[in-house]
Amino acid sequence: MDKFIIMTMLLVSTNAYDRICIGYQSNNSTDTVNTLIEQNVPVTQTMELVETEKHPAYCNTDLGAPLELRDCKIEAVIYGNPKCDIHLKDQGWSYIVERPSAPEGMCYPGSVENLEELRFVFSSAASYKRIRLFDYSRWNVTSSGTSKACNASTGGQSFYRSINWLTKKKPDTYDFNEGTYVNNEEGDIIFLWGIHHPPDAKEQTALYKNANTLSSVTTNTINRSFQPNIGPRPLVRGQQGRMDYYWGILKRGETLKIRTNGNLIAPEFGYLLKGESHGRIIQNEDIPIGSCHTKCQTYAGAINSSKPFQNASRHYMGECPKYVKKESLRLAVGLRNTPSIEPKGLFGAIAGFIEGGWSGMIDGWYGFHHSNSEGTGMAADQKSTQEAIDKITNKVNNIVDKMNREFEVVNHEFSEVEKRINMINDKIDDQIEELWAYNAELLVLLENQKTLDEHDSNVKNLFDEVRRRLSANAIDTGNGCFDILHKCDNECMETIKNGTYNHKEYEEEAKLERSKINGVKLEENTTYKILSIYSTVAASLCLAILIAGGLILGMQNGSCRCMFCI
C-alpha cells in the first residue's frame, strides 16, 4: 500500500511539470525526393529543377526579332532567287527561321560550294546591307542574262539578283573583260559568283562564242581559275546545263579582281555584314512567329523559367536553362516529412522531435511547443529557419554554378558526302547529353542527401542549445522534451526560446524540486530492498518446511528410513 502511494505521487508529480519540446514541421505533402542512399523519401516541400513547359512560338529575344524566310531557303535569299525579292531590302535578325518545305532554293540547277559554312557566316551577323560591286554596262558583253528556270514572282524569265549572267555581245564578240573592286566599307563583304557548264558545244558557242574559256576570281587571299565542263546532264527544271556557285569574303581594304572571256556568272551585289546575332538558323515546319519576347528561345519554342534545367530542346539560344535528358529532378527544399505519433498515456503529454513532426507549425521549419499552468503554445524558431532557407537558396545557386560549363548542341549541317561525319557527331552529342544528365542527377542526389542531413542536424542543434540554456533546471525526457523543475509561465518560456533565459534565477527552486525527486527515488529503492530481503527469507523458510514435512511423512508410512551407523 505504501509503495502504491509512493508511485502514484511520483507519477502525478512528474506530469505536473511545465514542459517545453523541440520539434519540426510536418505537413500533408506527398512530395518525395531521391538521395544517394534512399529512394522516394517523403519531404515537406520540393522544387522541380527541370522545366518541361514551353511556349510554341518563335519570339523576339534581347538581340531583336527573328527573320522568317517564308518560301525561301537561305541560299536563295543570299544569291537572290527572283521569287525571294521580298528579302532584297536591308534586313536584320536575332536568328533566322527557315521552313524545311520552302520551295525556293537555287533556281538554276547546280550546287553551292561550302554551303554549310556560307549559311553559318551569313546567319552569324545581325544584319546586312546590299552593296553594288560591279557595273557591267561598260563591259563588252551582254549583261543580265535570264533563264526559264528562274521565273520572277510576276511571271516571265529572270535570274538571280546578286550575280549577273554575262553572255557574248552581238555580233559574236566576247573578248577578255576584267574589273576591280576595293572594299572601302566599314566591314567584311560576302561576294558571290558562279560558273556555267553548258550541255553541249553548240550552246557554249551560242552563249559565249569562245569554245574554250577561262575565268579567274582573285583577292588578297583567293586565287581561283575556272573552265567549263561541257556535257549533257539529266534534265532538271527544264535545264541540261548546270551552274557551280561560289562565294568568298572580302575583308576591309582588300581588292577583288575578276577576268573572263565566257561562262562566268559574275558578282554584282555583295553583302556588308554587321553585328552579331545568335548565329542560328532554326529549321521547323510548324511553329509560328509569335508576338512575344523571351530570354530563352529553343528550337521547340520559347521558355521563360528560372529553373536551372530544361528538357524542351537541346538546341537553344539566349539565357537558357541547361538541357538535360531527364523528365524530372526534384530538389528537397523542406524537411523530412515524418508524421507525428499520436499522444499516448494518462495525460496525453506533448512530444518532441523523437516522436515525429508537428503539422501545426506553419510559420517556420523548426520550433518549440510548451505547456504550463497558462496553457499550451507553439512557436517557430525564426533564426534557425531562416538560416536553413538561406542554405537552400545557396544550394540552387550552387547547382547552377556547377552546371554552368558551357554546353550547347549545335545543329550541325553537313552535305550528302559528309553524312558519316554527321552520324558520328550525333552519337557524340547523345553521349555528352547522357553524361550531362548523369552529372545533373548525381549533383541533385548529393544536395538532397546533404539537405536532409542538415535538417536533422539543425533540430539536434536547437535541442542541444535549449539543453544548455536550461542547464540543471530541467530533466531530459528522452523524446525531444524537457520537464522544467520550476514554475515557468509564458514569459519564462519565451526567454527559453529566444535565448535570454537565466538559469541561475531559478536554480534554488530547481534544486529543491530535484532533491524531492531524488528523495522519492531513494525511498522507493529502500522499500524495494527491504521487500527483496523479506521475500528471500520467506521463500527459504517455506522451502525448509516443505522438505521437513516430506521427511516426516515418509518416515510415518515406512517409505523413508533413517539409519545411523557407528
Predicted regions mapped to residue ranges:
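Cleavable N-terminal signal peptides of Sec/SRP-targeted secreted and luminal proteins
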Residues: 2-16
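Extracellular, disulfide-bonded carbohydrate-recognition/adhesion ectodomains
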Residues: 17-240, 247
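Long, extramembranous regulatory segments enriched in acidic
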Residues: 18-63, 69-74, 95, 230-334, ...
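Membrane-penetrating hydrophobic segments
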Residues: 321-355
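Single-pass alpha-helical transmembrane segments
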Residues: 352-359, 534-554
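Membrane-engaging insertion elements
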Residues: 358-403
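Transmembrane-helix exit/juxtamembrane "anchor" motif
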Residues: 370, 374, 546-565
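Cytosol-facing boundaries of transmembrane alpha helices in integral membrane proteins
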Residues: 521-541, 560-566
